[in-house]
């Protein structure tokens, strides 16, 4: 059964389909075993169109209790490109440190309960490939949706946003758009925290004139009441094209999921 993965990867695969081959290569290098299949699929919710990123675990490893130190060792021992590996280690480290803080344990004792080895590795590797592909870009982010309610976890019911998300996204701007449920996942929050620490991700409005080059839209699985469940990424280049400035300068994305 194909499972819909995160909107971050989906949006960038809509923007740049060629990234799929690099994501598959990186996932193969990690050696998750079994019959793991990755797929990008066009999707329309009847209002907007974009892409979904799908994963079929097949007979792959599937554990919902994965120690951080096991994931770290697996990444260190892998043959994936160094920059992609460092991105993945950085994202998982952000997540592990947040989990350690909220549960009052040592970071070396962190076990990821809510994400299986395959799920989390694919999401983080996909994000790591994307960050490497756009390593020269400046990153900007709109206000984040807050969400409300509770989520059932291995630790029982927890309030939303989940405690790890709150820890990861301290200092970020949020808004309440009236939608309930989880709006930013811990993995998504870890990607944003890592982008802030490693790429200077900002939520401040851009004041320099830029030329809009392209966009991508990634859809999640949940249906929201009042809006499309998507993340949109906009790519900007310099206002006036010149040979020495012929590259992407700015990536801005909005989370409406």
Model-derived regions, located:
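Alpha-helical support elements that line or immediately flank enzyme active sites
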Residues: 7-19, 126-134
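Divalent metal-coordination and catalytic microenvironments
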Residues: 53, 119, 192
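Long, contiguous binding/interaction regions
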Residues: 109-116, 188, 249
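Mobile "lid/hinge" segments at catalytic clefts and subdomain interfaces of large enzymes
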Residues: 136-255
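Glycine-rich nucleotide/cofactor/substrate-binding loop typically near the N-terminus or early
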Residues: 14-103, 162-165, 170-174, 179-189, ...
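Conserved short loop/turn motifs at secondary-structure junctions
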Residues: 12-13, 41-42, 111-118
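Short, small-residue-biased leader/transition segments that mark boundaries at the very start
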Residues: 2-4
